[in-house]
């Protein structure tokens, strides 16, 4: 399920473009066994904290519940390093709330991706992220040892890992896990 067309998808991936502002109840979910949830926004683009929560938490949970009803057994979600449902930071708290809810839903396999700054093209301008993407290669070199998990990572690298992952159970993936996969 996507909000917009994704270029160069493998032939075994079915893409369903939907308007998340309309009712998801009207969407006919295709049969599948693995749901990848990569949806997210910013408070600025959502217009408010409530709008952000709607996209980053409510829509994601609704999609997961609908997918589970049609037999999906594996879910992969992109969250954020530092996600914690008790965080004082609103963004990290919402990300943590999503993880907590997904873990209670009973999927056979749950893959949780916890990246630092996501690198990639955006349809909209994000001033601070643009600056971050420019300085990330310099800062990344300073992040060694236990700090490596905070390195920036290309969104494409996470997507490729999601599609190839053969793990079972509950799994947490950080920068090194994704980049060192053979």
Feature-to-residue mapping (PLM):
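Structured catalytic cores of enzymes that bind and process phosphorylated ligands/cofactors
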Residues: 8, 16, 32, 62-65, ...
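Short aromatic-enriched loop/helix-cap "lid" or pocket-rim segments at secondary-structure transitions
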Residues: 10-13, 27, 123-127
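NAD(P)H-binding glycine-rich loop region in Rossmannoid oxidoreductase-like domains
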Residues: 13-62, 66-69, 84, 166
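Conserved Rossmann-fold NAD(P)-dependent oxidoreductase catalytic core, especially the SDR/UDP-sugar
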Residues: 49, 54-97, 104, 108-111
């Amino acid at each position: 399920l996507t909000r917009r067309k994704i270029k160069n998808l493998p032939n075994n991936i079915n893409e369903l473009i939907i308007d998340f502002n309309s009712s998801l109840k009207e969407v006919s979910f295709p049969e599948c066994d693995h749901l990848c949830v990569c949806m997210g926004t910013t408070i600025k683009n959502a217009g408010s904290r409530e709008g952000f929560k709607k996209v980053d938490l409510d829509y994601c949970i609704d999609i997961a519940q609908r997918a589970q009803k049609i037999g999906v057994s594996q879910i992969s979600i992109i969250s954020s390093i530092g996600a914690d449902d008790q965080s004082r930071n609103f963004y990290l708290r919402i990300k943590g709330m999503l993880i907590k809810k997904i873990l209670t839903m009973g999927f056979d396999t749950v893959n949780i991706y916890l990246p630092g700054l996501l690198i990639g093209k955006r349809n909209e301008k994000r001033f601070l992220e643009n600056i971050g993407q420019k300085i990330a290669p310099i800062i990344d070199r300073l992040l060694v040892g236990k700090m490596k998990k905070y390195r920036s990572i290309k969104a494409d690298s996470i997507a490729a890992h999601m599609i190839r992952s053969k793990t079972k159970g509950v799994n947490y993936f950080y920068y090194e896990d994704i980049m060192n996969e053979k």
